Amino acid sequence: MIYLYLLCAIFAEVVATSLLKSTEGFTRLWPTVGCLVGYGIAFALLALSISHGMQTDVAYALWSAIGTAAIVLVAVLFLGSPISVMKVVGVGLIVVGVVTLNLAGAH
């Protein structure tokens, strides 16, 4: 269940981050409301996953890595962001770092 909380937290964070540009500096009401609600839900669900037993370092590392990869994917597919070798390498390094952190915590 803690991983479900975390995955939902990541989803909410990705949605909120994807709305940031459309808020136009938090001057547009509904995108701003959606963005802030999304971040609120994301942090509440992250807190639930941690309070139900997930280690904070693991939760935050997974949140960061999966969230970053998902935001890059959303930005490239839906927001017109160009893809580059450096973006792919950067996301790959983040994923390798998270795997390493999780393996270190498993022993």
Swiss-Prot record:
UniProt topology in membrane: Multi-pass membrane protein
Any Pfam family: Multi_Drug_Res
UniProt-listed InterPro entries: Small_drug/metabolite_transptr, Small_multidrug_res
Chief location: membrane
Transmembrane intervals: 2-19, 29-51, 58-80, 84-106
Locations listed in the record: Cell membrane
GO BP terms, alphabetized: response to antibiotic; transmembrane transport
Presence of keyword Coiled coil: no
An example Gene Ontology CC term for this record: plasma membrane
UniProt keyword terms in alphabetical order: Antibiotic resistance, Cell membrane, Membrane, Transmembrane, Transmembrane helix, Transport
Keyword Transmembrane helix tagged: yes
GO molecular function, one term: transmembrane transporter activity
Note: Extrusion of TPP is inhibited by CCCP.
UniProt similarity note: Belongs to the drug/metabolite transporter (DMT) superfamily. Small multidrug resistance (SMR) (TC 2.A.7.1) family. Mmr subfamily.
Role description: Multidrug efflux pump. Confers resistance to tetraphenylphosphonium (TPP), erythromycin, ethidium bromide, acriflavine, safranin O, pyronin Y and methyl viologen.
Identification of the protein by name: Multidrug resistance protein Mmr
